[in-house]
Amino acid sequence: MATVNQLVRKPRAPKVDKTNVPALNACPQKRGVCTRVYTTTPKKPNSALRKVARVRLTNGFEVTSYIGGEGHNLQEHSVILIRGGRVKDLPGVRYHTVRGALDCAGVNTRRQGRSKYGAKRPKS
C-alpha cells in the first residue's frame, strides 16, 4: 500500500483499455480501397466460403473486412466503408464492410433486416 506522500509525488496511473478495432482510430467508420477480394474458409467446426476483402484505409492501415449478405459487387480498387465488428469463425477478421455505402451495393433480395444490408424497402 502506497503512503499518502508517495501518491502525492507519483499518482496512480489509470488503466488503459485496449481497443478491439485499432485501425478505426476511435472513429465509427473508415473509408478504404479494396486491394484484394477473395474467399476464405472458417475454422472448425464450420464450413463455408466466406467473402472477405483486404482493404487499404485512408489512415494507412491495411485490414481484412468481411462482406456480409448474399452476393456482392466488390472488386479490386472498389472504395468501401468499413465498421468494427469481428467475425468469430474467421481469425484475423475484425471489421465488416458497410453494405449500401460508397461502391458497395446493398443486398437486393433482402426483405427482413434490411437496414444492415443497405436494402431499400420493396414496393408492396
From Swiss-Prot:
One Gene Ontology CC term in the entry: small ribosomal subunit
GO molecular function, one term: tRNA binding
Top-level taxon of the source organism: Bacteria
Keyword Ribosomal protein: yes
Transmembrane regions listed in the UniProt entry: none
Assigned keywords, A-Z: Methylation, Ribonucleoprotein, Ribosomal protein, RNA-binding, rRNA-binding, tRNA-binding
Name listed for the protein in its UniProt record: Small ribosomal subunit protein uS12
Classification lineage: Bacteria, Pseudomonadati, Pseudomonadota, Gammaproteobacteria, Alteromonadales
